[in-house]
Amino acid sequence: MTDPAVSPLGCDGLRERRTQAPKETITPASLDPLMSKMRTDESSTVEPEKTTFGRTPDGTVFTVPHTRDMVSQLLSPSEPKNLSDILVLSILALHLLLLRALPTSFRIPVFAFIFLSWRAAYNIGIGWLLHMQSNHRTLVLWARKLQLFVDPSTGENRHPLLYRFIKRELETKIPENYSFENAPIEYNTWLVFRRVVDLILMCDFTSYCLFAVACGSRPVDEGFFMMLLRWSTGLSLVLFNLWVKLDAHRVVKDFAWYWGDFFYLIDQDLTFDGVFEMAPHPMYSVGYAGYYGISLMAASYKVLFISILAHAAQFAFLVLVENPHIEKTYNAPPPRKRVVDPDTALHEEPGSRSNSFNSDATPPMSLPGTTQPRSTHALVGSIDFHRVTDLSVLLIHLLFFAFTMVTPSTPIYRFLFVLNAALWRIWYSAGIGYILDRQSARKSWTRHFVKFGEGQDEAWRQWQGIYHLSMTTCYASFIAAAWKMYTLPQDWGYGLAILRHVLGASLIALQIWTSMSIYESLGEFGWFFGDFFYDESPKLTYSGIYRFLNNPERVLGLAGVWGAVLITNSRAMIFLALLSHTLSIAFIQLVERPHMQKLYGRSLRRDAGLVKSIKRSLPNSLKQFQGSVDKILDESIDFVEEVIDTARPKLAAGVNTFVKDTTALFHKYPARITITRLEPDLAGYELKDYALSVEGTELTQFNKSGGETKEKSQSSRGSENLVFEYGAPIKVKWTAPLNHSKKDWVGLYMVTHNSSREITKVSSQGRWVATNEGAFDSSTSEIGLKSSDISEHSQGKNGKSREVASGEMVFSGDKLWWNQGVFEFRYHHNGKHNVMAISRPFEIRIAKFDENEIPLDNHGVVRPAIEAALLPIVQNCLDRDADIAPQNSEEAFGSQVDRDSKYAKRVVFAVQHMFGIEFAPEVVCADGSVRNLAWRICNAKKVLAPYSMSRSSGTTTPVQED
């Protein structure tokens, strides 16, 4: 019987639940796009029956008469009976008589053969007829060739008796709104086909029930309670099966029940609720629950196995017959797009590509987008040993297989295999979950690849490989552990050994089918959590298995794990199953659910189809109780989330404090192992004669043109804070008494590193310059020294002038900290750490680049502004060396940048704080110019833009202010 809700169709169709479409007047012209109007109503209210119009393949439109279901026609005394009904009932009676007449020893094999024959007539016979009708219109052609429905009065019908017999049979069954002579040949052929189907289906079910009766017995030593439980469970399954069939017929009517769309199409409003919201393919999935209920009541493995065989044959019928017809009828490929006229393309205006750059200005790289990637070489379902991921999976699995086979099943090895499976499950759920959580919150995974100059697509490919390897290895380790814990039963007939294996295998098959259904619904993109990586316009759809369950992986997705528990009958496997289920639920609740709520918000569906169906069937008292339980659970979850949210900042603050303290300790560590050298005798040196003043390039915010305004900052500017540009040279002017030591030196320190103003206790780590040449045995001490011991007069506080020595030095390059913070210079005496003078504190800061304040160019791009802002910073990072630093954005960096990584490290630090993008130093070397680096920054900002917290005034959707 046709399942009207089985196909994951992308267009409107009989088998797809869609929203109700507005009614239109039915005319032959409007029936051309008939299937586009075959809508379904999500509500459970059944409207009064309306006239249904049908259309044949040649376009003939006719009124479809109302027909009754098979069981009512055959068994209801109020329904008129004809010869075909009597024939069907007689054959059913022969089955009953045969069961009574056969000896007990022959009943089981005979009825097994009879049932399998009728099942073959169903799945193979009817399947072949439908296949031929779908592809070649065979049944209609047979009827036309035999002229079965041609009036004998025309002289063209060679079988007048058969004509009158068929006419009487059909008109007896359809007394209203039906004319045998005027009905299309497709409709009459379908009615005759129905009678054949009635015979096969009734005999199929009857022979199955009689086979179960023949096999029925009571197990030895079965207690009354077990017998009561067995029969009550079996009857419940049979009643549930009966409800499924009746509800399905109520929804789909005879048209879908008897595969009417193989003959003609109809236009009607169907109500797909009830059973069609509970499970996919309900006629072929939960619609066979009664078979297993009968098997349970019969207490026979023979009935169970023949039920499984019949169920499998029915799924084969679905896959080989129905689904191809559904795809062909309701999911036809779209018409080919029209090819653009070449003449039109030649006349396209050059300026039509407003977002393109000149070829000489654009680096030879493609811009990765933020839309969903097109999968041309899927990772799931295709094995390619040219790919690292597939080869790694193969090698690891071969290693697992070999290690599992060669090691004995001793307790220590079993423990190791279970431990290995547990660790892989923890990584697969907790480790992968942490990566996705950080990706959802900060896009950390993507940022890592952007840091090394890669794009979003590379991050996506690497993530696919990691996830695929983790998933397959997790299950491979679980299978290996199950193999080690499994022992063959010594007596298959003892206890529930066979049942455990059958149920376990069924659960494993259920998990495999669930995984396939999830992948079919989500595709490669959804399978690998693509919405964590790509910012498409959020559009949530519920198709395939997700029409019935919100999270199928919560239960059905782990059915095979519990199947392994049943098969192995091991407590260790129970532990692994509980661990797997707990971690999977935690993954859904803590990772998937928050991301889905953030991404889709209120468009998330609260109840799936199955939950809706169950809730509608509950009494009001249970509904209220269920609502109270849901409220308690929601409040508990909210409380836990609130506690976590409250504790997170404190934990983060504690971690940050620990990191800062540790960092400061490392900064101070050289001083802890170095004895501070102090000058014991400072007599004759007046501290008032020592002084330090600083000059540097003052930092200003970027102006509207994208550049920077630079001024010289003097120490005489009063109380105004000094803020210097990152990497810019800093000039220091010092004064000291004429008799100052020739081994005096000036060091650069962070203000927070020294608590004492008399003694320096922290090493300068090479950031110092001597006041005089030749005073130290190191040439680096003189780098930056400009002048020394220049006599000048200084005005004292008492107004008296005195002669002092002065000098200048410039701190640049390696003499700078290349960090942000507040710094100071300290003047030290005679090569020791006595502090004679301290400069005014000043701050080194990197200005944030705000693209909202930068006007776009003619192409809507901010890259020129980024180039202008980046150029002076890069020049500073390259020491303003004419052999290394570029003079403009197009000029390449000097070769020294490739040889010494310190230059690239300075640049990436500046870029990170300036634009909020972290690159690896290798990116700077690879780009080789400011222009290419600016392009990469634009590209990275485009990739990371969806995760930016700042409002943009660019070309994105405007945000309405309150």
From Swiss-Prot:
Compositional bias segments (type: Basic and acidic residues): 38-52, 338-351, 789-802
Residue spans, topological domain Cytoplasmic: 107-109, 217-223, 299-300, 414, 484-491, 593-962
Any single GO CC term annotated in Swiss-Prot or TrEMBL for this entry: perinuclear endoplasmic reticulum
Region (Disordered): 1-57, 332-373, 780-802
Catalysed reactions, as listed in the record: a 1,2-diacyl-sn-glycero-3-phosphoethanolamine + S-adenosyl-L-methionine = a 1,2-diacyl-sn-glycero-3-phospho-N-methylethanolamine + S-adenosyl-L-homocysteine + H(+)
Pfam family, one: PEMT
Polar residues: compositionally biased ranges: 352-361
Lumenal side of membrane: 1-85, 131-195, 245-277, 322-392, 436-462, 513-571
GO BP terms: methylation; phosphatidylcholine biosynthetic process
The EC number(s) this enzyme carries: 2.1.1.17
Bilayer topology term: Multi-pass membrane protein
Keywords linked to the UniProt accession: Endoplasmic reticulum, Lipid biosynthesis, Lipid metabolism, Membrane, Methyltransferase, Phospholipid biosynthesis, Phospholipid metabolism, S-adenosyl-L-methionine, Transferase, Transmembrane, Transmembrane helix
Membrane-crossing residue ranges in chain numbering: 86-106, 110-130, 196-216, 224-244, 278-298, 301-321, 393-413, 415-435, 463-483, 492-512, 572-592
Domain of life: Eukaryota
Function (record text): Catalyzes the first step of the methylation pathway of phosphatidylcholine biosynthesis, the SAM-dependent methylation of phosphatidylethanolamine (PE) to phosphatidylmonomethylethanolamine (PMME).
Family: Belongs to the class VI-like SAM-binding methyltransferase superfamily. CHO2 family.
Name of the molecule in the record: Phosphatidylethanolamine N-methyltransferase
